[in-house]
A protein has these predicted regions:
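N-terminal catalytic or cofactor-binding beta/alpha core of small enzyme domains
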Residues: 1-138, 149-158, 187-198
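Polyanion-binding loop/helix "lid" in catalytic or ligand-binding cores
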Residues: 141
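Active-site-adjacent mobile loop/cap segments within catalytic or ligand-binding domains
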Residues: 145-189
Length: 199
């Protein structure tokens, strides 16, 4: 019996993708006339626009992650280092524009929950130079990453959160390839939505 897939509930979890700085180029993931953004197998892309107001953007991203349909967040931005793409592995408890701790009661370091080793392997397989970096660059991306990680529930089903940094001079094609590689790696670890919540 043939079943029209368009009539079935979409059980793919959402993967939020955010280029946090609106001054960065917007790497367009809309590839055809449908107007729908590219989505990796097993997930559906939820684009979230960047904002120069980093605290407000962090609030919006945290709110998105609290939605039961959203299972992952990929932050995208620039690195201050020359050379390869960088997958940031941790964020420090640090204020955005001044010295001191952002959260007096929070952990000093928060580690990403995304599958870094697999993301790195997929970047390399796509022909892109890439490293996993333990240093937390002092910028809005690290601030937003810490905010999102520190707000995660202590649960086995916590969202997958990662941060991809591109070097200056990365081409639009390289950016699209990198985003697709890491998003696909993240999506492979996501669980389909329960039937009761699928739209």
């Amino acid at each position: 019996v043939d079943t029209d897939s368009r009539t079935r509930p979409d059980r793919r979890p959402a993967l939020a993708i955010c280029v946090w700085n609106p001054d960065y180029p917007t790497w367009d993931l809309v590839e055809d006339l449908s107007g729908e953004p590219w989505s990796p197998p097993g997930a559906r892309t939820q684009p979230i626009p960047g904002d120069t107001d980093s605290p407000a953007l962090a609030d919006r991203l945290i709110a998105a992650l609290k939605d039961q349909d959203c299972a992952a967040l990929l932050l995208i931005g620039r690195t201050s280092h020359p050379g390869p793409f960088r997958l940031q592995m941790r964020a420090e408890n640090r204020r955005l524009d001044s010295a001191g701790r952002l959260d007096e009661t929070g952990p000093g370091v928060a580690r990403v929950t995304a599958p870094i080793a697999e993301m790195l392997r997929d970047l390399t397989a796509a022909g892109l130079p890439a490293i996993a970096a333990s240093d937390a660059e002092e910028d809005a991306g690290s601030y937003i990453l810490y905010r999102a990680l520190a707000d995660l529930p202590d649960s086995l089903n916590s969202p997958s959160i990662g941060l991809l940094r591109a070097p200056d001079g990365a081409t639009e094609e390289a950016m699209r390839t990198a985003i697709k590689a890491v998003a696909s790696a993240m999506a492979r670890h996501l669980t389909p939505l329960p039937r009761s919540s699928a739209a």
